[in-house]
Amino acid sequence: MNANLIVVTGCFGAPVKEKAQEIARQKGLPLVDLDSEITKRDGRSIRRLVMMNGEHGYRNLEYEVLSELSSGASPCVVACGDGVLYDDDSREIIHSGELVIAGTDLSEDELWENAKADADTYHAFMSFGTEEEKRAAFSDLIRRQCSMFEDEILQGEKK
C-alpha cells in the first residue's frame, strides 16, 4: 500500500473537496485538488480540456498527475472528480493508497441540487436541454457511478 496517497472521490454532486479538506486538516497533510493541479499545469479549464482533447485526453492528464503524486516523498490528500476511477491506470494508483468515497450518505435529490450549483462541470449534459432532460441524464450517470463506487467499497472491504 502507498501510504503517501489518500484519494477522495464521489458521485457527481458529492462534497468531495469538503471531505478532502476535512481529512487533510485532521491528518495534518497537504491537500491537492487534482483538477486545479491539471488546470495550473495545462493553463486551460477542465471543461476546455475535455472539449479540446476529449475525456480520454483528460483522463491521461489525471493519470500523469496521480502518478507523480504517488511517487512523491511527501504524503498528501488528493481531491478527485467523479470519473477518476474510470481509468484503469489511475484506479491502480488509487488502490495502492487509501480511497475515500464522499457523499455516500446523500440522496440522489441532494446530489442533484449540488450538481446544479456546480458552474465548472465538464459534464456536457448539464449545459443543454430541458431541466427534465438534464435530470434524466444525471440520474443515469448517478446509477452507473453508484454501482462503480459500491464495487470499490466492497473491494476495499476485502483488503
Regions found by a protein language model. Give the residues of each.
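NTP-dependent small-molecule kinase module
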Residues: 2, 22, 26, 75, ...
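ATP-dependent small-molecule kinase phosphotransfer cores
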Residues: 36-93, 126
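A glycine- and Lys/Arg-enriched "phosphate-lid" helix/loop adjacent to the NTP-binding pocket
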Residues: 96-144
